[in-house]
């Protein structure tokens, strides 16, 4: 009888261990997220005590409150307290009083690693991929969007994360917590609805040639996505230009204007001193899909354009122009003209010629642009007072891969309501030639 009890207890323990292992496995592999990357210091805080463990297992206790972790002389410091020269782990002594990084809570483990010849640090958050996605998807889409659009975003974000696990790019971590990787907000960014839909697609991954895809995504395409080769110069088979239904996006169309002096100054600050701006050379924007050209991609996004100056001409990529001028995207037309008023103030007189009031008469905004001289693909200044450069564009982001507002548009179609797992149709539209599989 005693032996039977021992065996029963043993099997129960084995089953519990197996259950815990299976549960952990169902959350996917661990991913290391760079929260604070290559900085001189970072703020850690907790309402309770924090245990700091160095690479040799030595422990130091930090009191409740805020502490600044920094690197000096190849060693870590917590405020003025000297710590180890190796990597550090931070553990809350009370689980109900977690450690915060720059006042944000995170699941999983927190460590600090040295970078830049032991002069700077990176704070890393290691946690299962599925739990990581809880803090990503809610930051990337509006949580109350159609379920199928959110599921598509979840699969794209998961595929992107798994791709980076297979293709190490950084020292000490796998992916950044910013838009240079995927925007990740930790526990406080999570939303019950997006978490539910991440769980509904658990493990589902977009795959091409047997490996997770580099599932780029963006907010708004402006009507047509772009092929990767026309944005980054690298042909990726599954990232091609496709038509997009994102017209409901607030960034579907936009206009920004700059004076000559503003453009000249911005170019100079970026290392391109062209002197006085005289004109801009760029193939006119046509209807997508556009035929191949050296200036524009299939969607019409700018691949390159030339600023003509009194000192020299400079040719920049569309991405460089977008970054320098702070444009929403590289999908734009350029015109030169004057910023005319939106309305004219007109006097209203009675039958006797006396003014009885005034009225603002609106002016068609189309008359505000296009005053400059245009010769082929060259826009020149006409020399009139207050001329500006107008960028009339569409979309938000690089325009490659899944369009978040476009996915929403597809999910709202009638056909989407009749088809189960329509998120798969959405993914196959934006990522050509992929297949979907459960990786865990």
Name these PLM-found stretches.
Residues 2-440:
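Conserved, single-site charged/polar hotspot
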């Amino acid at each position: 009888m005693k032996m039977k009890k021992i065996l029963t207890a043993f099997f129960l323990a084995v089953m519990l261990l197996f259950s815990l292992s299976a549960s952990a496995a169902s959350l996917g592999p661990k991913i290391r997220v760079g929260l604070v990357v290559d900085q001189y210091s970072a703020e850690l805080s907790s309402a309770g005590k924090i245990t700091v463990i160095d690479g040799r297992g030595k422990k130091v206790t930090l009191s409740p409150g805020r502490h600044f972790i920094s690197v000096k002389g190849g060693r870590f410091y917590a405020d003025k307290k000297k710590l180890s020269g190796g990597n550090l782990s931070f553990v809350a002594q009370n689980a109900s009083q977690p450690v915060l990084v720059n006042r944000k809570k995170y699941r999983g483990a927190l460590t600090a690693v040295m970078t830049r010849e032991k002069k700077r640090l990176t704070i890393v958050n290691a946690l299962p991929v599925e739990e990581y996605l809880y803090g990503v998807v809610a930051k990337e889409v509006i949580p109350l969007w159609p379920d199928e659009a959110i599921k598509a975003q979840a699969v794209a974000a998961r595929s992107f994360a798994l791709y980076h696990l297979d293709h190490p790019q950084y020292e000490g971590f796998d992916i950044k917590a910013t838009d240079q990787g995927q925007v990740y907000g930790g526990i406080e960014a999570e939303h019950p609805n997006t978490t539910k839909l991440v769980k509904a697609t658990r493990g589902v991954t977009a795959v091409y040639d047997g490996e997770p895809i580099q599932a780029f995504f963006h907010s708004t395409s402006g009507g047509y996505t772009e092929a990767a080769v026309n944005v980054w110069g690298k042909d990726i088979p599954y990232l091609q230009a496709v038509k997009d239904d994102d017209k409901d996006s607030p960034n579907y169309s936009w206009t920004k204007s700059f004076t000559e002096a503003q453009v000249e100054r911005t170019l100079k600050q970026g290392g391109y001193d062209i002197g006085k701006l005289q004109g801009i050379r760029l193939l006119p924007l046509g209807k997508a899909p556009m035929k191949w050209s050296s200036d524009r991609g299939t969607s019409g996004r700018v691949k390159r354009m030339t600023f003509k100056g009194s000192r020299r001409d400079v040719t920049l990529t569309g991405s460089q122009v977008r970054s320098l001028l702070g444009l929403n995207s590289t999908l734009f037309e350029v015109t030169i003209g004057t910023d005319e008023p939106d309305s004219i103030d007109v006097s209203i007189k009675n039958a006797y010629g006396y003014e009885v009031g005034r009225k603002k008469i609106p002016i068609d905004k189309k008359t505000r642009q296009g005053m400059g001289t245009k010769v082929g693909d060259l826009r020149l200044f006409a020399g009139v007072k207050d001329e500006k450069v107008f960028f009339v564009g569409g979309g938000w982001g690089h325009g490659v891969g899944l369009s978040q507002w476009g996915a929403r548009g597809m999910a709202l179609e009638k056909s989407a309501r009749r088809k189960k797992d329509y998120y798969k149709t959405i993914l196959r539209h934006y990522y050509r030639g992929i297949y979907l599989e459960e990786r865990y």
